[in-house]
């Protein structure tokens, strides 16, 4: 079964998903895929007291952290170094994405697809699919899209994607 977690920007989708992942891990459920927590700093002028600076990707199950995207307006020089190849100019995204990070995360999904299924059925997690993957195709986490499109597998009868 495919579960889709959706909601407005910065409403806590990934925080909720992290809580679910923690509970499933406590129960021994195999989890594979990627979680995309925000990179935050304290900012008392913001309604929630924090300001989002970027997005990391945490590979499941290993926990490797990959710096994935950073806000363009905060560090234009750093952001320009993270420009995703093939990004259409008209997309005007607030985030600069790292080619290396996208390649690393896509390679992770390729390895999951080619690897052996866990001994116990688990959950495939994709946090998150957005405009790059859904509006333009061929950009972003394309290998995650391919894997989810294959449908249930013995190792992951269920998948949860964040959109």
List each language-model region with its residue ranges.
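N-terminal phosphate/diphosphate-binding loop that engages ATP/GTP or pyrophosphate donors
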Residues: 21-88
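Loop/turn-to-beta-strand initiation segments
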Residues: 120-123, 151-162
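Phosphate-binding/switch loop-helix module in NTP-utilizing enzymes
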Residues: 75-136, 142
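Hydrophobic positions on the alpha1 helix immediately C-terminal to the Walker A/P-loop
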Residues: 16, 20
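Conserved lysine of the Walker
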Residues: 13
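The conserved Walker
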Residues: 9
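Short, conserved "post-DEAD/DEAH" coupling segment immediately C-terminal to helicase motif II
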Residues: 137-151
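Hydrophobic anchor at the beta1->P-loop junction of P-loop NTPases
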Residues: 5
